[in-house]
């Protein structure tokens, strides 16, 4: 039987909204965010927003409280727990950040469902302030992918996962769920036995629609949390039956 690995993007896929935008809006940073929007790469812009919160006297507990209000649709929660209980290996590959993702998942009792989270790391500085760092450290040579932002190439993450499973006695089959342009690079790494689930009318879906001959995986689009749940669990069931037969 193949091991089913499910890779979730986070923003606008696992959650319906965007965790960065949620914090910016809920914590009153909209004005300064738009002032700086096109002066910094997104990852560094969000780090700058954390410094702005510090200057306003906001604490890390204030950020935690904000993140706890971020909803996750009940259909997604049910899908995650069902896939986990079915023996799937669930991972997150996201251009959000470690702190935001973990606090949202913890609040919804989901963090233990995921074996790994590949995202931009976070740390606390000497003053106890949250800092957001790039996944691909500035200390390392830049990746050469022109499809992805400089701070995170999801295709390299997929290469790592593929390489780490090369000696497995049990083959892996991947299901990749995403919405953004940054999800196109890992989609190109999927094989004929894998599946990609793009969100309808979002950038990943549009890139796949414009470049169908580049995609080896079977495409299963979704447009709502309920549809995502239904299709994902159907795929898990189908793969399991195929491998058991």
Swiss-Prot record:
InterPro entries: HAD-like_sf, HAD_hydro_PyrdxlP_Pase-like, HAD_sf, Pase_PHOSPHO-typ
Keywords of this entry: Hydrolase, Magnesium, Metal-binding
Cofactor section: Mg(2+)
Disruption phenotype: No visible phenotype.
Catalysed reaction equations from the record: thiamine phosphate + H2O = thiamine + phosphate
Pfam families associated with the record: Put_Phosphatase (PF06888)
Residue numbers annotated as active site: 9, 11
Gene3D superfamilies in the record: HAD superfamily/HAD-like (3.40.50.1000)
SUPFAM superfamilies with a match to the protein in the record: HAD-like (SSF56784)
GO biological process: ethanolamine metabolic process; protein tetramerization; thiamine diphosphate biosynthetic process
Chain positions recorded as Mg(2+) binding sites: 9, 11, 179
NCBIfam families named in the record: DKMTPPase-SF, HAD-SF-IB
Function (record text): HAD-like hydrolase that has a thiamine monophosphate phosphatase activity in a heterologous system. Does not contribute to thiamine monophosphate phosphatase activity in planta.
Assembly and oligomerization: Monomer.
PANTHER family: PHOSPHATASE, ORPHAN 1, 2 (PTHR20889), THIAMINE PHOSPHATE PHOSPHATASE-LIKE PROTEIN (PTHR20889:SF19)
Protein name: Thiamine phosphate phosphatase-like protein
Species assigned in the record: Arabidopsis thaliana (Mouse-ear cress)
């Amino acid at each position: 039987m193949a091991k089913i690995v499910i890779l979730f993007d986070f923003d606008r896929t696992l959650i319906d909204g965007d965790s960065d935008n949620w914090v910016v809006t809920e914590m009153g940073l909209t004005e300064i965010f738009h002032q700086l929007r096109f002066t910094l790469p997104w990852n560094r812009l969000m780090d700058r927003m954390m410094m702005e919160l510090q200057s306003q006297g906001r604490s890390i507990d204030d950020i935690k409280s904000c993140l706890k209000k971020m909803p996750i649709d009940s259909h997604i929660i049910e899908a995650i727990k069902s896939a986990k209980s079915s023996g799937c290996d669930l991972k997150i590959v996201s251009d959000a950040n470690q702190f935001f993702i973990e606090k949202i998942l913890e609040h919804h009792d989901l963090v233990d469902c995921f074996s790994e989270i590949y995202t931009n790391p976070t740390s606390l500085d000497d003053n106890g302030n949250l800092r957001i760092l790039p996944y691909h450290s500035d200390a390392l040579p830049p990746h050469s992918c022109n499809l992805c932002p400089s701070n995170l190439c999801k295709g390299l993450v997929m290469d790592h996962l593929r390489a780490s499973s090369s000696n497995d006695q049990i083959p892996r089959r991947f299901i990749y769920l995403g919405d953004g342009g940054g999800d196109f690079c890992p989609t190109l790494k999927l094989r004929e036995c894998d599946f990609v689930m793009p969100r309808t009318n979002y950038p990943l879906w549009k890139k796949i629609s414009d470049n169908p001959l580049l995609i080896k995986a079977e495409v299963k689009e979704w447009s709502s949390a309920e549809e995502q749940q239904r299709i994902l669990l159907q795929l898990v069931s189908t793969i399991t039956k195929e491998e058991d037969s």
